[in-house]
Amino acid sequence: MRCPKCNYNKSSVVDSRQAEDGNTIRRRRECESCHTRFTTFERLEELPLLVIKKDGTREQFSRDKILNGVVQSAQKRPVSSTDIENLISRIEQKVRTAYENEVSSTVIGNLVMEELAELDEITYVRFASVYKSFKDLDEIEELLQQITNRVRGKKKSSVDDEAY
């Protein structure tokens, strides 16, 4: 594995363990030249999964596209890179389990929104505002009302649980 700092092509594995998603191996490596430590992830190569875009074109599924959208939405929020990596792994696993060769971009976008709603409401709103292409404030207000109702429902059920 090539070192990201000095580009030397030999490194040794210092630590290796299964990642939280269960489908990935996380390896800590150390460059044999400059001794920089870096992390790599190893996962099973899957058959190509095609994403059907809204205009009907098809392109290969890309974790990086989801990553870029989520990272941008999570800027300055208390969302760790591990949280984001796990979120993307869950989405990919759901898609690969439910769809054999092709999936619509709408399905992927909705899965991202479901996961973000559980992770961080502000990140969810930021992602939704781009993904849903809101046309006016009424649409944003409706989304915020849905989130408020969901949060109130969670608080009410946790209060009910404490009463027992």
Curated annotation (Swiss-Prot):
Binds 1 zinc ion. PROSITE patterns: ATP_CONE. It holds the Pfam family ATP-cone. One of its GO terms (molecular function) is DNA binding. Keywords: ATP-binding, DNA-binding, Metal-binding, Nucleotide-binding, Repressor, Transcription, Transcription regulation, Zinc, Zinc-finger. GO terms for biological process: negative regulation of DNA-templated transcription. A zinc finger (unnamed) spans 3-34. Residues 49-139 form the ATP-cone domain. InterPro entries: ATP-cone_dom, NrdR-like_N, RNR_NrdR-like. Its cofactor is Zn(2+). PANTHER family: TRANSCRIPTIONAL REPRESSOR NRDR. Belongs to the NrdR family. Negatively regulates transcription of bacterial ribonucleotide reductase nrd genes and operons by binding to NrdR-boxes. HAMAP family: NrdR. This is Transcriptional repressor NrdR. It comes from Streptococcus equi subsp. zooepidemicus (strain MGCS10565).
